[in-house]
Amino acid sequence: MKLLQIRLLVNDFKKSVEFYKDSLGLPISWLENEMEYALFDNGETKIELLSRETMAEIVGEEKKSLEGEAQSKFLLQFKVEDVDKTYDDLHEKGVKCENKPHDRKEWSARVAHFRDPDHNLIEIYKML
């Protein structure tokens, strides 16, 4: 078994597409506005966006609540050349970061964290 891609189920499809395309600069390889589906192919790892409503219909969960957020359930990690520069670029684009770049000695890495429009946690990461 091999992981193919990660599908994020989003509340505001248009806003999420703009965030991943414009703020993060990920290239879109497939976009279906009517179905509210987008595929970003960033090399080895692909990220899909699909509206939560559409996915709920597909799996028969349309009557279940979309509310009830808790602590983060997962994290998307992006390897970058320079955490501080990437942080500054994101900040200039209006991305609200959770923390400033800092070293995690136990990971031998420099990291910073922010969230997408659906509050999914994202980490930028560089080995020390």
Swiss-Prot record:
Annotated PROSITE patterns: GLYOXALASE_I_1 (PS00934), VOC (PS51819)
Pfam families, per the entry: Glyoxalase (PF00903)
GO molecular function terms noted in the UniProt entry: lactoylglutathione lyase activity; metal ion binding
VOC domain span: 2-127
Keywords noted in UniProt: Lyase, Metal-binding, Nickel
Amino acids binding Ni(2+): E48, E123
InterPro entries: Glyas_Bleomycin-R_OHBP_Dase, Glyas_Fos-R_dOase_dom, Glyoxalase_1_CS, MMCE/EMCE_epimerase, VOC
CDD domains xref list: VOC_like
Similarity annotation: Belongs to the glyoxalase I family.
Protein name: Uncharacterized protein YraH
Gene that this polypeptide is encoded by: yraH
